[in-house]
A protein has these predicted regions:
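A short glycine-rich beta-strand->turn/loop micro-motif centered on a GG-aromatic cluster
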Residues: 144-147, 167-180
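A charged, well-structured terminal subsegment
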Residues: 196-208
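Glycine-centered short loops/turns at secondary-structure junctions
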Residues: 69-72, 139, 165
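Short glycine/serine/threonine-rich phosphate/pyrophosphate-binding segments
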Residues: 151-157
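Internal catalytic-core helix/loop-beta-alpha segment
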Residues: 100-148
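Active-site-proximal loop->helix
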Residues: 179-191
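Active-site acidic carboxylates
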Residues: 1-113, 208
Length: 208
């Protein structure tokens, strides 16, 4: 099921062409959402290890540099549960819960001072968090999504952002999951109904 797949962006663009609703749009005032870039998904001995995360990390860092230069909002999320917290359907589905304070909950990329760090125990970064309020208080109209996993937390966060009135930009070569099939399936569905598909360098050009 797992593979280290190359970032075949040009091929992906051709495949989503017949489904995507928008291309070439630019955000007005975006925030960068860095979803779950943490040790749980990067350690080869973890059952949640994502082999292609190492390929997209440089692009995630490029996006961070670009947003920081423009003093635009950056939000980091990480997946973890607190002791005694009701795990609900997530606990029944996945069994193995990452707990707050564990080594595998720690980030791979260090947030800068003033950047929001958001713990989330569910797929969506908006579910039972203050993310929507935080973004709207800052006047954010658009969210740019990078991180892992493409087909779970990134996709669910993208859909949820759309439903809450944000324009969504999904960075194809700065998101990753277990294999290319799952990654591409998310790009196809999101491009049709929820998000504008973009590349890292395209976002950097907006910001320059």
């Amino acid at each position: 099921m797992k593979e280290k797949y190359p970032l075949r962006v040009e091929e992906w663009k051709k495949k989503i062409e017949k489904y995507e609703r928008h291309r070439g749009r630019k955000p007005s005032f975006p925030a960068l959402l860095v979803v779950d870039v943490q040790k749980f998904f990067f350690s080869p001995d973890s059952h949640a290890y994502i082999p292609s995360l190492s390929l997209v990390l440089p692009n995630i860092n490029k996006l961070l540099q670009g947003f920081r230069k423009k003093n635009l909002p950056v939000v980091f999320t990480y997946y973890a549960w607190k002791e005694g917290e009701d795990k609900g359907s997530m606990g029944r589905w996945w069994k193995d819960a990452v707990m707050e304070g564990e080594e595998r909950a720690k980030p791979l990329v260090a947030p800068h001072r003033g950047e929001k760090i958001l713990r989330k125990p569910h797929y969506s970064a908006f579910y039972k968090t203050d993310l929507e309020e935080y973004l709207k208080d800052k006047g954010v109209k658009d969210v740019v999504i990078c991180g892992v996993m493409t087909h779970l937390c990134c996709e669910t966060t993208a859909r949820d952002a759309f439903m809450r009135g944000f324009d969504v930009y999904f960075v194809m070569d700065a998101t990753a999951t277990f294999n290319e099939e799952l990654h591409l399936s998310s790009l196809l569905t999101l491009s049709h109904g929820f998000a504008v598909m973009v590349e890292t360098e395209e976002v950097i050009r907006w910001l320059s």
